[in-house]
Every structure is written in C-alpha cells, then in structure tokens.
C-alpha cells in the first residue's frame, strides 16, 4: 500500500480537530489511538473498496464463514504490519513526539470471542486475505463481549467488557444494508400480495439487524476482505406514548429486548430464558447473514438459484449457526417461491460443517417447545427435513429402531443441531487427525456409516503474522537473519532453521531472545497486576478456557505436590519454577470457578510461605485475552497441553507455543500428536493414558480412582487437603465439590471422569523430565529451535489451502 507521511500527519491532525476539537498537545491517549487508527483506515480503504468492487464486477465463488465468535484481538498493529506500513507509521509518530506503544496499549481487545473457536475463525480470515481468496466472515457485534474477568478474593467475578465504550475506529456502519429478522408469530398459508400461494408469518416480533464491517487486511498484497457483524435493535424503538403515561420501563421494553440479542457473547443458559436468548442470537446471525447473501446474489446474478452454489460456499463453524440450514430453505421457498426439492438441492451443495468437539454437552440441542415457539416456521421445516431423513435411515438400518430413534434430528423432545448439520452439509470435518478418527469410529460412527464420503480432517492452524511476526519481533528477526523472508507467507520455510540446531551462536541468541521476552512479561505483570516473578525461573504456562477436561486441576495438584514436598523434605530441591495460568470460566460453570479459586488460594499460600520463596511461584493472569497471549506465549518455556486424551478436538495454543519455542508438556490428544510427530518425541514431554486406553476403560467400566489414592500417599494428601479444614480452607467446604467429583462422583457421574488421579504419577514424572532437560541450557535451546523449525505445518495458511482444495474450491483473486 502507498504511504504518504505528510498525508498521514494531515489526516491524523484533522481527525483530532474534527472529532475532538483538539490538537496533539491536548489529545488524550484514547484520542491519539482513535486518530492513528482512523488515519490508517484511510490508507487501507481504497484497497478495501477495490476488493469489494472486483468481487462484484466479476462474480466468483466466495466463502462465507459463519461463526458465533471471532476472537480478533487488537487490530492496529496487525493491520499496519499486513498493510506493510508499520515502520513508516512508527517513524511518523516519532516525528510527532507520539509514543506508538502507548497508542497501541490504548486499544481494547475486540469483545467478539472467547476461546479457540473464535481465535481459529480470526486466523482463518487473516489467511484467506493473505492467500488472496475471496472469503468473508459473518458474526454478531457483541456490545459487551463475554465478560471482563476480575479476580476478587481469589474468585472470578464477571464485569461487562465495555470494549465499545468509545466506538471502534476500525468498523464502518452500513445502515443501508440493514435487514429485518422475525421471531414468533403464527404460520399462515395463502395468497401473498404478489398472488403466490406460500407460507408466511403474521404477528411476528421484528428485529432490525444492522451490519458493521471490519477490514481484514491481507499480508503483502492488496486484498482487504470483510468481517460483517450484526447489531440488533428494535424498529419501534422508544415508545413515547407509554413514556408520557409514566410507564417508563415499558416504554423501552421492546428496545431492550431487541438489543439483548447482540448484548453479550454466550449468555448464561442454565435456565430457559438463557436458552431462548442463545437461540435468538443464533437465528438472528444466520437469518441476517443469509438475507444479505441472497440479496446480493439476486442483485448480481439473478433468481436462478441453481447457480447459487457456484458462487457461494458457507462454512458453519460448529453448531451455533446450523439453524442457517432451515432458514435458507425458508427464504428460498417462502420469499422466492422455489420448490422444496430445488431448495434442498441448493442447501446441500452450499453448506459445509466443522465439528469442534466430542463433548456431548457441546453438541447443541434445543427443547422442542423453545424452538417451536420462537421459530415456528423454521421448526415446521426441520420437521419435514427429519420426516424425509427418517425414510433414508430406515432404508440404511432396517429394523434397528434404537439407531433410527437416536439418529432422528428431532427425538426425545429435542432438536439436535449437529444431526441436522451432518445430514444437510456436503462436508463434515474434524480439526485434528485424532479428533476426526474419534468422530468416525466413536462419537459419530452411525453417521460415518451413513455418509462416509462427507467426513474429512482439516487440522487447525494459526497465523504466523500475528503469533510470530507481530507478537515476537526479536524471534522473527532471528529467523529472517538466517533464512531470509518468505516464511511470513510460507511457514514451511522454517524447516531451513534445522541446519542451525548445533550452531552455538544461534542457540545463544535464541536463549537471549527467550530471556528478553521473560523480562518483558515480568515487567508487565509487575505494573499491571502488582505481581513479582523471577524471570530466571522456568516459565511453565497453561493459558486456555477453563474446563475440567483441560485439566487445570491436574496442573495445580502438581504444584500442591511440589509445595508439600519442599515443606516436608529439606533435601527436596527442584529447579525454581513460575507457573502461569490464564483462563476464564463460563459464568454458569460452578466447578470451573472453584478451580480458579483453588489456583489463587494455592498461589496465596505459596507467596506467603518463606520456606518456598524463590523456588515456587504461581500467577493467575487476570482477564486472559489475545493481547495478553501475545505477551505470555513468547515468554514461556513450557507449554501445558494436558487435556484428557480424546477430549481436546485440536487446540491451537499448542501451535502458538511451539512456533515461539516453548516445549510441549502434554498428552497424546488433539494436535499434540501431530506436533510430536513433526518435532520428534525427544523434543517434547508426553505422558498419560491414550485415547484408546481411555475408551477401553470406559467400555469395561473398570476405572477405580481409589486405587491411585491408596498407592500414592502424596496424591492422597493433596486430595484430602481440599477438604481437611485447615490447609486451604478453614470450613472444609469451599472445594468439597471438586473433591467429591474425584472421589465419589457428582451429578450422577462416576468419579474422576477426566482421569486426573490416573494420570497424576505420569504427569509428575514428565515434570521431572522437564526439570532435568531445562538444566542443560544448550540442549533445551536446541529442542526449542527444532520445535520452531518444524512448526510450519501448523500455519492457518496450510489449513486454508486444505479447505480450498477439498471443500471450498475457491480461486485466487488478485486485487490490482
């Protein structure tokens, strides 16, 4: 992109003057961030407009990625780097006596996602634009994100993530493209105003969906794709009559109900109202997005919908947007008078589905009454899809009534969204080799028998532009100095680093880069959280969504083990470690919140005990998010990837850590298996039961956690300390549910369903291997270099090329 320094200065000062009535000397940090971002957007805008123009001038097949979340992180540095103007902007700001780092730190993380699902979507958008494929995202513009996590008295407390308090300078509101989404109402059949016999809805609640567009800037080219986010409002808005009647609450009731749809990501759904709000969100996203797509198709191509799959492929990111399938049927049949068979043909050639989990709880299903009341016409269509599908199932599995019932899209009083997706989509992919194998052989075995041609694997990836080039500039420079440029868009080139594995100078430099990053993180935590950590210790890190299967509890048990050993045995002298945690627990997930409380309680005990000072430290990083990950990951020595084998679909933090030279301590789960295959077992620390072993134990019902407590007094002591009324909690009740979930089982489940006690000894042994390996500085550095050199497979660029080859069949569009 062309950069004119004087024009940039003029735009920046003009923005300050017009927007805030200030000059640079009067501007606040936020004013400067807004002005710098707006001025950068001015440079990006011509390419953004030209990208859209070329896509429309010569219609070509485009990907549309529907996702409940996009965990974008900060936009400023990423966009400047991808646009190739990062250094120039820094230089101009320096001339203007503006500190770029202060400007960058003023940007909030976009509150559009939470975990790996959303971060994957963000990486995919980056790769699509960089590889010059026509691909855009559709999501919801959440006003308050999921939540901002504060730790108070060791416990997670949720506050609104008010990331839009100042508006986002990177978004462009498109009121001209607003659409109406309808809920409820009564189904009618008869003549419409144009004389056609169709189904239609009367007395529906109408919600206005207004799009806000964000630019997705490709690296080193002119492509700027779009992430379109929908905001919900009421077309009626404020009721002045009710207000004048002094009914103030009722005057804004409709407005509030509408705006609640795009208020918060993943509202607590423990009750029926929360479930209904989630379904409203999902239908709102899909209906608005499909109306938008179909409107543009009719405008540019016409109403021959048999051509629709030639120009569109829609990827459903997990089950959240699966209601798009019956919604497209509704639009085609009810609004364009297309017949059922023709509509179904379009749907089954357009939609593809990515499965991200084998956890039954995450395969969404909706109570029939909720679904039917909220979306009566959509439910009617799902009923008909299911009726026709059951003929197919009975033909494939005659006489097997249990299987027929289980595979019903509607059964046991619920609508099964994953079943609907697998039936309707032409492709169903898992996200790591093990995950896809388990789907085909275990969780979705019946479906794989019915539709073997649909199932395929696409191992996840991450974008090296954000997770290496931007977040670890010293390491990026180290790489470029040795192998040149090109790795930024072809990460397989990192393989050339292997020839430096025994080069003393390279290993010394790698050690120093890691130390510098550790120093920076220590300094950041000192100033942001008032936490002191020693950057000469091993940084052992587990940062990810808090869930029992991810086994943060196993990690803290090992820390409790180390603490007990150090206190009880003066001769026990392990290497000094700093354990870093970062995680949010879902607001309604009680045991996950208890684990956060336990981590912070143990951390507090350790920091106040002089006997372990300098040997052991635990830090829980508050409000973990992308911008924090960009500081933590480059500084980490050990990457904790310790989920119960067979439960983590893929994971992507494991890839980011590998790319940044942290060694994997993990189970043979998700993408860990492929990481170990790439880097070599000798360059990782693998432990624990395998997925096959766990499947066998589950099938035999042979697991007895008590035997692990009986044979390991250290483990028995740790588990007992949860409830002994003296070590960590005077009442003995604070961690009672965690204790009982391991020893007795809770909520009708058997004890220790995630095999924490079974894997404890192996985990401790693996940690001892980590300690021993770390003592050999050069040997450790060699392992890190080999990990970096073999991380090329885990670029999202490779993942996107796999999707394009096997599923999407897109053609590159070179923007002039």
Residue spans for each PLM region:
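A conserved ligand/cofactor-binding region detector
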Residues: 1-816
């Amino acid at each position: 992109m062309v950069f004119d320094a004087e024009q940039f200065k003029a735009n920046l000062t003009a923005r300050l003057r017009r927007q805030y009535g200030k000059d640079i000397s009067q501007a606040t940090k936020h004013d400067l961030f807004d002005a710098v971002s707006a001025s950068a957007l001015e440079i990006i805008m011509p390419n953004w407009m030209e990208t859209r123009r070329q896509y429309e001038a010569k219609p070509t097949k485009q990907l549309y990625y529907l996702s409940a979340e996009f965990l974008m992180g900060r936009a400023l540095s990423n966009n400047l780097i991808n646009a190739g103007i990062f250094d120039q902007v820094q230089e101009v700001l320096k001339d203007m006596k503006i500190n770029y780092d202060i400007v960058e730190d003023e940007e909030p993380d976009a509150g559009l996602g939470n975990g790996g699902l959303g971060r994957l979507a963000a990486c995919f958008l980056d790769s699509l634009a960089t590889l010059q494929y026509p691909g855009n995202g559709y999501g919801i513009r959440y006003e308050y994100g999921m939540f901002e996590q504060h730790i108070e008295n060791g416990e997670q407390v949720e506050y609104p993530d008010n990331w839009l308090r100042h508006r986002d300078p990177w978004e462009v509101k498109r009121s001209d493209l607003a659409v109406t989404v309808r809920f409820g109402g009564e189904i009618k059949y008869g003549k419409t105003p144009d004389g056609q016999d169709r189904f239609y809805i009367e007395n529906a609640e109408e919600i206005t969906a207004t799009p806000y567009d964000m630019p997705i800037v490709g690296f080193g080219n002119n492509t700027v794709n779009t992430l379109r986010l929908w905001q919900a409002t009421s077309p009626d808005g404020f009721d002045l009559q009710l207000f004048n009647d002094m009914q103030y609450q009722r005057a804004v009731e409709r407005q509030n109900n509408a705006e609640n749809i795009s208020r918060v990501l993943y509202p607590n759904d423990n009750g029926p109202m929360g479930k209904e709000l989630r379904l409203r969100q999902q239908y709102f996203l899909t209906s608005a997005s499909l109306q938008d797509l179909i409107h543009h198709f009719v405008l540019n191509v016409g109403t021959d919908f048999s051509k629709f799959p030639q120009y569109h492929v829609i990827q459903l990111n997990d089950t959240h947007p699966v209601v798009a399938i019956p919604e497209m049927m509704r639009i085609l049949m009810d609004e364009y008078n297309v017949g059922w068979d023709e509509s179904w043909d379009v749907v089954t050639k357009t939609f593809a589905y990515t499965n991200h989990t084998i956890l039954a709880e995450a395969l969404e299903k909706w109570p029939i009454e909720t679904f039917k009341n909220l979306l009566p016409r959509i439910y009617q269509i799902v009923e008909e899809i299911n009726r026709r599908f059951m003929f197919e199932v009975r033909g494939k599995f005659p006489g097997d009534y249990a299987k027929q019932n289980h595979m019903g899209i509607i059964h046991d009083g619920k609508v099964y969204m994953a079943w609907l997706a697998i039936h309707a989509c032409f492709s169903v992919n898992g996200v790591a080799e093990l995950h896809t194998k388990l789907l085909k052989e275990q969780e979705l075995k019946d479906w794989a028998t019915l539709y073997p041609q649909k199932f395929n694997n696409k191992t996840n990836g991450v974008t090296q532009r954000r997770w290496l080039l931007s977040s670890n500039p010293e390491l990026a420079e180290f790489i470029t100095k040795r192998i040149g440029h090109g790795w930024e868009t072809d990460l397989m080139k990192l393989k050339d680093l292997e020839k430096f594995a025994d080069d003393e100078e390279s290993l010394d430099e790698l050690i120093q880069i890691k130390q510098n990053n550790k120093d920076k993180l220590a300094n950041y935590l000192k100033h942001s959280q008032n936490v002191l950590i020693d950057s000469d210790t091993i940084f052992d890190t587990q940062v990810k969504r808090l869930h029992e299967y991810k086994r943060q509890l196993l990690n803290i048990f090992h820390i409790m083990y180390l603490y007990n050993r150090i206190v009880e045995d003066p001769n026990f002298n392990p290497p000094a470690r700093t354990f870093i945690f970062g995680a949010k627990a879902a607001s309604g997930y009680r045991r996950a919140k208890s684990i956060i409380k336990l981590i912070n309680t143990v951390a507090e005990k350790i920091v106040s005990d002089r006997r372990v000072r300098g040997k052991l430290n635990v830090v829980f990083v508050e409000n973990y998010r992308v911008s924090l990950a960009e500081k933590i990951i480059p500084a980490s020595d050990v990457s904790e990837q310790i989920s119960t084998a067979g439960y983590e679909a893929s994971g992507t933090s494991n890839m980011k850590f590998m790319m940044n030279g942290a060694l994997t301590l993990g189970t043979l789960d998700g993408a860990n298996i492929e990481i170990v295959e790439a880097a070599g077992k000798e360059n990782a620390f693998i432990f624990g039961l395998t997925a096959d072993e766990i499947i066998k134990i589950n099938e035999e019902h042979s697991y007895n956690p008590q035997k692990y407590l009986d044979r390991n007094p250290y483990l028995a002591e740790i588990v007992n300390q949860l409830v002994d009324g003296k070590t960590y909690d005077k009442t003995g009740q604070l961690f009672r549910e965690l204790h009982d979930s391991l020893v007795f089982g809770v909520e009708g489940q058997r004890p220790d369903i995630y095999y924490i006690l079974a894997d404890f000894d192996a985990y401790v042994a693996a940690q001892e291997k980590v300690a021993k390996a770390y003592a050999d500085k050069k040997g450790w550095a060699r392992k890190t270099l080999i990990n970096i050199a073999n991380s090329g497979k885990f670029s999202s660029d490779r993942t996107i090329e796999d999707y394009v080859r096997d599923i999407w069949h897109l053609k590159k569009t070179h923007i002039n």
